[in-house]
Design a protein with these regions (language model features):
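HDAC/HDAC-like amidohydrolase catalytic core signature
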Residues: 1-154
């Protein structure tokens, strides 16, 4: 089996430690421990170790965000330092950086799949990104990573 075929058949797991720095101001359901539990479970699964390829995400840029979000929403998130954006969604010191790498993971996953380098992809990102709308953060999500990835794939 060639190296290329070997990579394609692995589960490619996009992850970066920056995701753990997106921390709530107080106790919150969406917290680093959610991702830590996934990583711990993967470490314990000896049968999976040879089938997972850990990859680092790229960082999304403002143009990527603007492909699905309004300028006012992007600027609001980029200038907010700390606090709650709604009852469910918080932002803290490293949240913006984590969110940019979360969106970037989706872009890189799209590239890898389109170029037929990867077949199976899992983006273990924080903050999550599928509830945010064009104009606002919500449901724990600052940006809509799923929409950014889909738009990028077009």
């Amino acid at each position: 089996m060639s190296v290329e075929q070997n990579i394609i058949n692995k589960i490619c797991f996009f992850y970066d430690e920056i995701y753990l720095l997106h921390k709530p101001i107080d106790w919150h359901t969406e917290r680093p421990e959610r991702l830590i539990s996934i990583l711990t479970a993967l470490e314990e699964r000896v049968d999976l170790k040879d089938n997972i390829n850990f990859l680092k995400p790229d960082k999304a840029n403002e143009e990527d965000l603007l492909s699905v979000h309004s300028e006012s929403h992007v600027k609001n998130i980029m200038t907010k330092k700390s606090g709650y954006l709604d009852p469910d969604t918080y932002i803290s010191e490293h949240s913006l950086e984590a969110a940019l790498f979360a969106a970037g993971a989706l872009k890189r996953a799209v590239d890898e799949v389109k170029e037929r380098k990867l077949k199976y992809v899992f983006c273990a990102v924080r903050p999550p990104g599928h509830h945010a709308t064009k104009d606002r953060a919500m449901g724990f999500c600052l940006f809509n990573n799923a929409a950014i990835g889909a738009r990028y794939a077009q």
